[in-house]
């Protein structure tokens, strides 16, 4: 498949008009074919400027979000991911729900072999919340990998003063 064919379904990348959506919007996510589906490899996104709203107070919440996955046939297009995460800006939800929803939306889009999403939210009221979501494709080695990474994901927590 040529690069031009591969990118024909990408509507956001290279667009002169970037549609910034201010409400939760999973339909903005786009994918492209993984040319290296014969390899297991990680793709990692570091998203240090995530914002959402507290569903009770309406106050802004800030986080760094780390998304890592082992693709199968599809990869997420990074500009669409940026716009998708931006769509949470005026979305009111708890930290745990945001991270789980992001993970589930990406699993639905990509059907990856493995995926994890880790949110590191800045403290509010003196407490920081760091929800972690992961997924391993059922009945494969990735299901076992997900279980092991879930059990061990935070064995060496960082100092709290890093935020």
Swiss-Prot record:
Tell me which UniProt keywords the record has, alphabetically: Cytoplasm, NADP, Oxidoreductase, Queuosine biosynthesis
Class of the enzyme per the UniProt entry, highest EC level: oxidoreductase
Q: What InterPro entries does the record tag this protein with? A: GTP-CH-I_C/QueF (IPR043133), NADPH_dep_7-cyano-7-deazaG_red (IPR050084), QueF (IPR029500), QueF_type1 (IPR016856)
The reactions it catalyses are: 7-aminomethyl-7-carbaguanine + 2 NADP(+) = 7-cyano-7-deazaguanine + 2 NADPH + 3 H(+)
The family classification in the record reads:
Belongs to the GTP cyclohydrolase I family. QueF type 1 subfamily.
Q: Which Gene3D superfamilies match?
A: 3.30.1130.10
Query: Which residues are catalytic?
Result: 54 (thioimide intermediate), 61 (proton donor)
Q: Which GO terms describe its molecular function?
A: preQ1 synthase activity
Task: Name its GO BP terms in alphabetical order.
Answer: queuosine biosynthetic process; tRNA modification
| SUPFAM superfamilies in the record | Tetrahydrobiopterin biosynthesis enzymes-like
Q: In which pathway does it act?
A: tRNA modification; tRNA-queuosine biosynthesis
Q: Write the Enzyme Commission number(s) for this entry.
A: 1.7.1.13
Binding-site residues, substrate: 76-78, 95-96
Specify where it is mainly localized.
cytoplasm
Q: Name one GO cellular component term.
A: cytoplasm
The molecule here is called: NADPH-dependent 7-cyano-7-deazaguanine reductase
